C-alpha cells in the first residue's frame, strides 16, 4: 500500500551486534556478544528505473548455489509501483548484501527486470538456485486487478519460466515455501479469488517441473480498496514442524491456520482462527520467526489507528499478543518482511517501509531474559 504484553516465557529476539570497520593499520577489536548498539542497515529500494513501493522481501537461504548475481545472506525486494507511483506497474527485484554499501535512492542494484508489471509480495528463493516472484497488474493503477503469474528466475537474474493458471494463480499476492532442495511446495495466496493454492514441484537444473496445483483454502474476503487497490488473503507462513500454514487475511483482519497444508487434497473454509485482535490493522506480510512466534505487518487499510501506524505485530501460534513496533510514523508503511534462522551470525530479519521506499535489515540474537 502506498499512503502517506505479556507472553509466555521463551526466547525473545533482540539486536546484539554492531558493524565495526578497520581504519589504516588499526585492527578493530572483536565484536562483543553483549554489544548494546544493534547491528542494523537501512537502505533505499529504489533502482535506476525509479520503481517504488517495495512489497516482497526474501533472504537468499543457506545452501544456495554459488557463482551467480546473488548469494546466501543477500536480501531481495520486489517493487509494486513504477516511478510515477502507479500501483501495479513496478517491474524490478532489487538485491543487496547487508555487508555492502548503503544504496542511495535510484541506485539500488537491479537483480531482475520483468516484462510483467506489478511485482507482488509473493517473493521467495529456492535452495535449488531459483527465485520465484508473483505479479498482479492493476487497471491503470486501480481495481480491478488482473490475473498475473508466477515467474521463475535463475541466480543470474534470467527469466526461466512463467506459470499461469486462472484458478490456482489468480492474483498471486504472497507465497511461502517448504523447500527440500530437489523438490518443494509453494503456497500461494490468490488475492483476486480469495483462495490459497499449493504447488507441488520438482526443482531441477533448468527450473520447475512436474507441477501439480491444489486449492487448499477458500472463502477469504476480497474487496476493492483505494489505498491498497485490493484486500484479500496476503501473507503466508509455513511451519514445517507441524505442517501448518498460517494465512493473513487482510479483508477479514484476522490470521488463520490450515492444518496438514502440505497433504491437503481439498479446500477448507478459511481454516482455524488464530488471531483476531485490536492489534491487527489489515495484516499483510506474515512470517514465522525463529523463536516460533508469528510476525505480521499492518497495512492500515482496516481498523486504522493514527496512534499505531505501520506496525509489525508479534504474536504466538496460540493467539497471544507479544509485542509491536512501527516501521514508520505515517500509516501505510509496513508490508513485506522476512525472518530466518541462520548458523553464521548473518542478518536475519528485514522489513520494508513503503513510505520512504527503503528496507531495514537487522541481526537479531536469541536471549532468555524476557
Per-region residue spans from a language model:
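Bacterial N-terminal signal peptides
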Residues: 15-25
Amino acid at each position: 500500500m502506498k499512503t502517506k504484553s505479556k507472553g509466555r516465557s521463551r526466547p525473545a529476539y533482540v539486536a546484539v551486534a554492531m558493524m565495526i570497520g578497520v581504519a589504516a593499520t588499526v585492527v578493530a577489536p572483536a565484536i562483543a556478544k553483549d554489544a548494546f548498539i544493534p547491528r542494523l542497515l537501512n537502505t533505499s529500494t529504489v533502482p535506476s528505473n525509479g520503481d517504488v513501493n517495495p512489497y516482497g522481501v526474501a533472504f537468499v537461504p543457506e545452501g544456495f548455489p554459488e557463482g551467480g548475481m546473488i548469494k546466501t545472506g543477500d536480501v531481495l525486494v520486489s517493487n509494486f509501483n513504477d516511478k510515477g507511483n502507479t500501483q501495479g506497474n513496478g517491474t524490478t527485484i532489487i538485491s543487496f548484501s547487508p555487508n555492502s554499501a548503503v544504496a542511495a535512492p535510484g541506485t539500488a542494484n537491479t537483480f531482475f527486470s520483468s516484462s510483467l508489471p506489478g511485482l507482488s509480495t509473493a517473493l521467495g528463493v529456492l535452495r535449488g538456485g531459483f527465485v520465484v516472484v508473483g505479479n498482479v497488474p492493476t487497471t491503470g493503477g486501480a481495481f480491478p486487478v488482473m490475473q498475473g503469474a508466477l515467474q521463475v528466475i535463475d541466480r543470474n537474474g534470467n527469466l526461466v519460466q512463467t506459470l499461469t493458471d486462472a484458478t490456482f494463480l489468480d492474483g498471486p499476492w504472497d507465497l511461502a515455501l517448504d523447500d527440500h532442495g530437489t523438490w518443494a511446495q509453494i503456497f500461494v495466496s490468490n488475492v483476486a479469488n480469495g483462495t490459497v493454492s499449493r504447488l507441488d514441484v520438482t526443482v531441477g537444473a533448468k527450473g520447475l517441473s512436474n507441477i501439480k496445483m491444489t486449492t487448499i483454502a477458500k472463502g477469504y474476503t476480497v474487496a476493492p480498496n483505494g489505498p491498497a487497490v485490493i484486500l484479500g488473503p496476503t501473507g503466508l507462513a509455513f511451519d514445517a514442524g507441524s505442517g501448518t500454514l498460517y494465512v493473513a487475511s487482510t479483508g477479514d483482519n484476522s490470521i488463520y491456520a490450515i492444518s496438514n497444508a502440505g497433504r491437503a487434497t481439498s479446500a477448507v473454509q478459511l481454516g482455524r482462527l488464530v488471531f483476531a485482535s485490536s492489534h491487527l490493522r489489515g495484516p499483510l506480510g506474515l512470517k514465522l520467526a525463529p523463536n516460533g512466534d508469528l510476525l505480521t505487518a499492518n497495512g492500515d487499510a482496516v481498523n486504522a489507528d493514527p496512534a499505531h501506524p505501520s506496525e509489525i505485530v508479534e504474536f504466538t501460534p496460540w493467539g497471544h499478543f507479544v509485542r509491536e513496533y512501527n516501521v514508520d510514523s505515517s500509516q501505510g508503511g509496513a508490508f513485506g518482511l522476512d525472518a530466518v534462522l541462520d548458523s553464521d551470525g548473518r542478518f536475519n530479519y528485514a522489513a520494508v517501509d513503503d513510505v520512504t521506499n527503503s528496507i531495514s535489515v537487522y541481526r537479531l540474537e536469541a536471549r532468555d531474559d524476557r
